[in-house]
């Protein structure tokens, strides 16, 4: 039988949450990202989206996500158009559904970085074009593609590795790591104070995927138990965008700082251990935030020490670069009319 070369399991699909994809699909996007990174490094054109127009919607400020989507679009031959919080009125002056219909008639794809997951879902439902979640309060799928691409780049595999997230176990990055790792067969440890454990709903969702993949999941407030056997130690800011309860959060999370003592708890050989952070990081006092934190709480480092952040284990800048390559893979796969048959 002749294959239909128009077949593409991703074409026209939105990327709203990791749970919507199989392990095989996620691994394809990760591997495609690695391939596109090689093309980029060797100055080989890959303009799969020539002539396409991409809307970049940002309710929340961004450095890496905006830069990654912009450069990825241009490399793929598309034109990105940035619409910031002063340009879009989701649910304020115009309903999200109406905005979706207007943008969908003008653009070929939409990136959305905002607060409500429901807004991303409405945009995908009513725009008629692929919508890519650049971050919501619940999920961060584009970060996950970059993260697990970075892990595979360093270890040559994913399945069977152990990734430990230490910090606020309720935030979107922790949610996404727990679920994505469970889908991919990566053991995930969440090390956090009990008050900041992932919700039961998120844990149950991850457990369902882990039963199929064989991933081992652990949620604990015990540092020694949680760090043991880790290949990847990951952290994020202690207080997320828009939150104001700094003092309570800092006091809760002080024992959960990623420092050299914590890395030693892994018992993992140096060449089998890396540190990751989705950035920005409060690892010194070279920012206004850092100065404010020092004045209010008497600390010069928060979620990670400068020693770890600048150590041989650190991969956060490689991880940040991979945002571009993995986003490029996602955009090309869902909008580029490529031949990607079902496995």
Swiss-Prot record:
GO cellular component: cytoplasm
Catalytic activity: carbamoyl phosphate + L-ornithine = L-citrulline + phosphate + H(+)
Top EC class, one word: transferase
Domain of life of the organism encoding this protein: Bacteria
Ligand binding (L-ornithine): 172, 236, 240-241
A molecular-function term among this protein's GO annotations: amino acid binding
EC nos: 2.1.3.3
Gene Ontology BP term (one): arginine catabolic process to ornithine
Role this protein plays: Reversibly catalyzes the transfer of the carbamoyl group from carbamoyl phosphate (CP) to the N(epsilon) atom of ornithine (ORN) to produce L-citrulline.
Protein name as annotated: Ornithine carbamoyltransferase
């Amino acid at each position: 039988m002749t294959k239909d070369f128009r077949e593409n399991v991703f074409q026209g699909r939105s990327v709203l949450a990791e749970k919507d994809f199989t392990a095989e699909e996620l691994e394809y996007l990760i591997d495609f990202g690695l391939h596109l990174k090689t093309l980029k490094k060797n100055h080989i054109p890959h303009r799969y989206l020539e002539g396409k127009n991409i809307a970049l919607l940002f309710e929340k400020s961004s450095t890496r996500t905006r830069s990654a989507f912009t450069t990825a679009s241009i490399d793929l031959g598309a034109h990105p158009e940035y619409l910031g919080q002063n340009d879009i009125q989701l649910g304020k002056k115009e309903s999200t559904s109406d905005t979706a219909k207007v943008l969908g008639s003008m653009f070929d794809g939409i990136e959305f970085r905002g607060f409500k997951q429901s807004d991303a879902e409405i945009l995908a439902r009513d725009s008629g074009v692929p919508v890519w979640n650049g971050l919501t309060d619940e999920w961060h799928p584009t970060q996950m593609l970059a993260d697990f691409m970075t892990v595979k780049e360093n270890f040559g595999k994913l399945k069977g590795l152990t990734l430990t997230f230490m910090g606020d176990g309720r935030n979107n990055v922790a949610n996404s790591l727990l679920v994505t790792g469970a889908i991919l067969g990566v053991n995930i440890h969440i090390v956090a104070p009990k008050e900041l454990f992932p919700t039961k709903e998120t844990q149950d969702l991850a457990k369902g995927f882990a039963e199929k993949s064989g991933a081992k999941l652990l949620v604990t407030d015990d540092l020694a138990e949680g760090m043991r056997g880790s290949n990847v130690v990951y952290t994020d800011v202690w207080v997320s965008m828009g939150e104001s309860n700094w003092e309570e959060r800092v006091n809760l999370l002080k024992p959960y700082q990623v420092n050299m003592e914590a890395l030693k708890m892994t018992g993992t050989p140096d060449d089998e251990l890396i540190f990751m952070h989705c950035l920005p990081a409060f690892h010194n006092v070279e920012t206004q935030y850092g100065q404010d934190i020092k004045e209010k709480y008497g600390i010069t480092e928060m979620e990670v020490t400068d020693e770890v952040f600048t150590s041989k284990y650190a991969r956060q800048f490689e991880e940040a670069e991979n945002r571009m390559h993995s986003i490029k893979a996602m955009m090309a796969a869902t909008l580029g009319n490529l031949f990607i048959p079902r496995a």
